[in-house]
Amino acid sequence: MTTLNPLPPVEEQPIASVAPALPNEEDWFKPCALIPVYNHERSLPAVVAALRAADLPCVLVDDGSSPAAATVIDRLAEQDGVFQLRHPRNQGKGGAVISGLREARRLGFSHALQVDADGQHDLSGVELFLDRASQAPDAVICGYPRYDASVPKGRLYARYLTHVWVWINTLSLAIRDSMCGFRVYPLEPTLALLDRVRLGRRMDFDTEILVRLHWQEQPMVWLPTRVHYPADGVSHFRLWLDNALISAMHARLFCGMLLRAPKLLARRLQR
């Protein structure tokens, strides 16, 4: 009988561990600039040029502008990386921003940097704001203004009335400035809020959305930003109507705060 020699033992080889591939930032962080436009044909080209120089795509929302302004927007939208959305009639700054946020998401962007078309925002801070947004993708990256001598004193002092109401309506000092529109929105949670609640469509929008995002515990990061009011700048603030809308907005938020007061106070005690 033939005897079979046993096979030599097989030396076990260590199994190499494979680290999971980390997602490339470019795969999930896709920011754009969102610019609501209403008859800003003089200042808009320079704003778009500065943002495109930073390699940031731009979504222009024409909020019922004049034919002259619409022509400028059409010409800018011929550039690569510049998109436009047009409202047949003016809906107000808030309405333009809301439409722009939805359009940005439809185009595949993850975040939107809101920029005013009148040139008052210091765009040298774009890179810093986007860097912070990539580090904290769920946070709203909010600018709080550093004014120069060009700021109208009446407008500056009037802001403090809104600051006080925001602090009351959040039971917190966390929101440093709710009126500066230079901020980066994470689109997913922002649009989820806009799908649930109808917010103000005009000058009341910037403040109301921050208060409601605070209520839902959305993280916020605050960065200083320089603000300059051009001597020939275009303002569409309507003294009586917009102040009435802002007052009504504060009243709505106050009622909402009363309903949420136990939760808001409990949140403060936990910190």
PLM-predicted stretches and their roles:
Residues T2-W28, R196-R271:
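Hydrophobic helical membrane-anchoring modules
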Residues L56-S65, L85-H87, V115:
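Short beta-strand/loop segment that forms part of the nucleotide-sugar
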Residues K30-C32, P57, E208:
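Cell-envelope/extracellular polymer assembly enzymes that use nucleotide-activated donors
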Residues D62-T71, G119:
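A conserved acidic beta->alpha catalytic loop
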Residues R42-A46, P67-L76, S124:
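Acidic helix N-cap motif at the loop->helix transition within catalytic regions
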Residues S17-L22, Y38-A53:
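Short, well-formed alpha-helical segments that are part of the catalytic scaffolds
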Residues F109-Q120:
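Short beta-strand-to-loop acidic/aromatic patch adjacent to the donor-nucleotide binding site
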Residues R89, G94-R106, L123-M203, P230-F237, ...:
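Acceptor/aglycone-binding surface of glycosyltransferases and processive sugar-polymer synthases
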